[in-house]
Amino acid sequence: MGRRSAAPTSPFGEPRKFDPKFKGPIGKRHCTDVLCCIIFVVVILGYIALGVVAWIHGDPRKIIYPTDSYGQFCGQKGTPNENKTILMYFNILRCASPVVLINLQCPTTQLCVSKCPDRFATYLDMQANRFNNSYWEYYKQFCKPGFDKPRKSITEVLRDEDCPSMIIPSRPFLQRCFPDFSTRNGVLTVANKTEFKDGIGQMRNVTDLRSAANGINNVLDARSVGMKIFEDYASSWYWILIALFIAMVVSLLFLILLRFTAGVFFWIFIIGVIGVVGYGIWHCFWEYDSLKGVPGADLTIYDIGLQTDFRVYLQLRQTWLAFMILLCIVEVIIILMLIFLRNRIRIAIALLQEGSRAIGYIMSTLFYPIITFILIAICISYWAVTAVFMATSGEPIYKVMANKTLCKYADITCIPETFNTTNVTRLCPGAQCTFAFYGGESFYHQYILIFQLCNVFVFLWLVNFSIALGQCTLAGAFASYYWAFKKPADIPACPLFSSFGRAIRYHTGSLALGSLILALVQFIRIILEYLDHKLKASQNSFAKFILCCLKCCFWCLEKFIKFMNRNAYIMIAIYGKNFCTSAKDAFFLLMRNVIRVAVLDKVTDFLLFLGKVFVTGSVGVLAFFFFTRKIPVLTDEAPALNYYWVPLLTVLIGSYLIAHGFFSVYAMCVDTLFLCFCEDLERNNGSSSKPYYMSPNLHRILGKKEILSKKAKR
């Protein structure tokens, strides 16, 4: 007999061989990617140490409380400024914009006061009314502490800024005094006045303050809006929680209904697409036919050239003919895909239905996203607190405040305690050593930017690890369901808890490695976004083009890595191998079933999109009618609101996040069942000695023809 020729080796590896001992996720495992696990633990310890150092050096009061020119906090308990909670600027005209004010970079004396001025006044007026004690008593509260009944000349007082040269009616915002701007008939006013006296007694128009207070009016209006939004939340939070609970119930019901309606939803959509494209073909033909004989309609697109008005092209028969041909091609492609891929589409729909059935047997998986949410919330909180403490780790830096054109020492660093003994006060009359910002010269302060970048990177790593842990845990639970020969009798007890234990005990290193790769790509994308922001004003077109290409490439790379990591975690949950081996096995398995992968991915994406739209839309519509009091039986129950969109928007966002949490479990379930299904087809042939583990529904859809062909190959 002639020797049988060996089958050519597949470039994507050999199919899985039948193993009578294989019953799903293996129990005997060993720790994988130990080195990465050790690095991960060391990084976490270092991250904790960084947080401790930031906690020691940081002082959030620098953000909570405004700081005066002496580096003292306004409103801090136990200090002389305890009752002085607001920061006032002596000469607001020196401030370029509200952003400068908020960032404490305005080159004028800043003083903590108990209240903002409520009238116009100048130091010259005070001197003119020096015999009126009530006038001085009001004005002196805005002077430096201890400055009472001055003997200095007016020039010296204003030069040394012992008192403000003028005060302006102001309102507190962000614990700072801002001019009380308003508009009347389109005219800018302050306290209903359009003119005021400046510090030297000259009349000036209120518009002179515009550069220092541009946008202040909008900011003050935003404060009012913010208070109203807070009131709306206070009166509607109970109903918001009820709406979110309804969203959770609707999401659960949708997942249950998918077992029976997945195919209906998909085929309705396909028929709808075919119908819409068919209508487009008919409409293009109608437009093409109606333009017959119209003067100029027979010109070609080449004849009229490039036109900025697109409507010109719609008056040509050639345009509608091109549209009609294009739509015909699309229609033919869709129909051919349905003809040749119909069986794979049916398998995809059956897997979706099987996913709903699996979740029904392991209901605890629906609540696992809560654990992922808690882990991510902890990561976000720790990152935010660490970032704030690092940002406030600086020591107070004081600089000389003087006229730059007359004083060469302006803006240099100074020490308040010794400033009056230096030559600066003699060479630059009126110069002051005032607080500028927070900084430092130590190693820690010099590398705060590096530490902030490390904070961001480790944050990304931990968040991705939390997501990876959830995916691996869910994959192990759903794999236990699939490889149970008799469902649900053979499903192991507590499959979710067992899978979680295996992932933590054996595969922390593998999950850390996968999340590290993804975190690196995401970190690079953040840097590219920062560079793109910096280059927006640049005229270098080549640099913008290169940056755009890099952003596109890394976006695609991130999507690919997320996809591969997801499938690698499934293989880790089943076989317990290291990350690289699992990723390779998953990739080869997917490539051996590439058409099924594409079909299942699109069908799943579509149905989950429908689910999110259905849950968010249905709950959102219900919330809209309730909060706008358009439900007659609940009119009296609806709270009185300033803005109904406040709770409505909260309900919409919350409903979407809840639906996303439920459907992420469903998507992981379908992906896991799909990989198990592909392996089932490779391992077994449906015979009594090698029976399939798939459900009877999948077995029936697979068809006798494919089963028999597999038996022949075996």
Swiss-Prot record:
It catalyses: choline(out) + n H(+)(in) = choline(in) + n H(+)(out). Signal peptide: none annotated. It comes from the Eukaryota. GO terms for biological process: choline transport. The keyword Transferase does not apply. Keywords: Antiport, Cell membrane, Glycoprotein, Membrane, Transmembrane, Transmembrane helix, Transport. Residues 55-237, 283-320, 368-369, 477-510, 627-644 are extracellular. The chain crosses the membrane at residues 34-54, 238-258, 262-282, 321-341, 347-367, 370-390, 456-476, 511-531, 606-626, 645-665. It is found in: Cell membrane. It is a multi-pass membrane protein. Glycans are attached at N83, N132, N192, N205. GO terms for molecular function: antiporter activity; choline transmembrane transporter activity. One of its GO terms (cellular component) is plasma membrane. Residues 1-33, 259-261, 342-346, 391-455, 532-605, 666-711 are cytoplasmic. Belongs to the CTL (choline transporter-like) family. Choline/H+ antiporter. This is Choline transporter-like protein 5. The lineage of its organism: Eukaryota, Metazoa, Chordata, Craniata, Vertebrata. The gene is slc44a5.
